[in-house]
From Swiss-Prot:
Superkingdom to which the source organism belongs: Bacteria
Stated role: Key component of the proton channel; it plays a direct role in the translocation of protons across the membrane.
A Pfam family assignment: ATP-synt_A
Species assigned in the record: Pediococcus pentosaceus (strain ATCC 25745 / CCUG 21536 / LMG 10740 / 183-1w)
Gene Ontology CC terms: plasma membrane; proton-transporting ATP synthase complex
Name of the protein this chain belongs to: ATP synthase subunit a
Amino acid sequence: MSGESISTFQFLGLTFNTTNLISGLVSALIVFCVVFALSRNLKLKPTGKQNILEWIVDFTNGILRDSVDEEEEKNFGLYAFTLFLFIFVSNQIGLFLQIAWNDVSYLRSPTADPIVTLTLSLITMMLAHYSGVAKFGFKKYFEKTYLSPFKVWLPIGVFTEFIDFLTLGLRIYGVIFAGEMLLKMIGGIAFSGGIVNMIVAIPLALIWQGFSVFLGSIQAFVFVTLTSVYISHKVEDE
């Protein structure tokens, strides 16, 4: 472990994680700036930076298309697009922009904290449940989700929902947290044992950093894919 702690503050008797707030805001700001820059001067025939934006939109829509029908793809397209970009950027921040002072982290990957990833998981679940109720009505949706194929299925259905919530959020947290910890360990080796350790550690850090970029990208894809599958279970007719 790195020995670093997080920054917090108190408000109305509640403790807030300053590190997560700053990191999440920075990630959101980066996403906003990138999308804003790519979406200027849109043309009917895309060229240059507009191609990049449309490729990302097509990519996330394609993920949805594999799980839901065309109508639901339109309903959740913006959510999938935003979710993918936010998670992708959040996964990479800790590799390039970590900021700490006096062993207190102020900027790191937001997704390296289970509170953040479980919150994203909860948002997805709430959106899926809301959409299911809006489409089928509460009674039919409840029966479809928790009482099918048998009424005694209710405890298993509730337990399954809880497991889905945990696995969706904790999978990405485990990968990103482990990646950051390993980078910190390699960095500690580089600066604690002289020039020989540094010569060995720096190439290892670069290799692992490149691999972590790949893992972060894959995890963003996996999260959105699982999100689309989860949503499809709630809004699609069986």
